[in-house]
């Protein structure tokens, strides 16, 4: 059967669900796709469709980020379901780095947990502009304690640089909304959530006029067709027939885009902000990997050495407990990958304490492109 074309009838925005493990992120994601499909059309994704890796099903948690789509009255949403488990923080960073806004889930019956704090901090660090808070599991919560939970979350938002007083809070039960899609009382919270997202999440200005650039998040081999790379386009546009380069980590390769899709629908052209899959001519799956970028020819040059001005987060800000010295080899998170680098401090600087500002030189073990943000 021929694939449908993707029709741009509404503004597109990238959002996602973050928060502590088992606070209901995947359940809410499934509920939103069901509700959006019922009201505005689209594909229903149930819980098992989203939690679809064997290890995830076995452990009942989300490991890699999952992309789904749904619509509100005003917008088309690409939604990433982020893992909450502590072992998978770098996957959470991969998802959060693509978000224009995020839904932070907090279970009303238990309140903020360790990963709640961590995800708020990470969202701030990777540049998520705004959060909407969904107080979940209201059907299990003590009504007298819910106000205290909300106050505690607002304090956390203020602590990590968000506006705790102005951030919207929605109360509901994602499980009830998913289980009773025809019950207006159960789905009222989804109506409120989508309406709030439409009003509160600002669609950023997309860099459409810059050279095409897309960090590669995943790589697939499709029998009979070739290799597909997926990711969110950071800037520019791409269409079938465009020549592109695969840059970073390995020697640069040149290829041609032979197909562009978004959510299994054909795209005339992918543009900044779109989550796409690009089919590449003559590239084997083992020749490309997550962490590389797809880019317009000659538009970027990878580097292994750079100078940076940094602030070292203190223990209270979710950062280091101890100082570090020249020769320290941390992980640098760039877009969709992490790269080890060796730190050299300026002459006369013996060490960097938590809370310090300093300049330093970094030598990466694999090259990255100039201007890349890192955490």
Swiss-Prot record:
Record key words, sorted: Cytoplasm, Elongation factor, GTP-binding, Hydrolase, Magnesium, Metal-binding, Nucleotide-binding, Protein biosynthesis
EC number in record: 3.6.5.3
CC annotations in GO: cytoplasm
Entry-linked PROSITE patterns: G_TR_1, G_TR_2
Metal-binding as UniProt keyword: yes
Region annotated G3, chain positions: 81-84
Source organism, top-level taxon: Bacteria
Protein name per the record: Elongation factor Tu
Organism whose genome encodes this protein: Spirochaeta aurantia
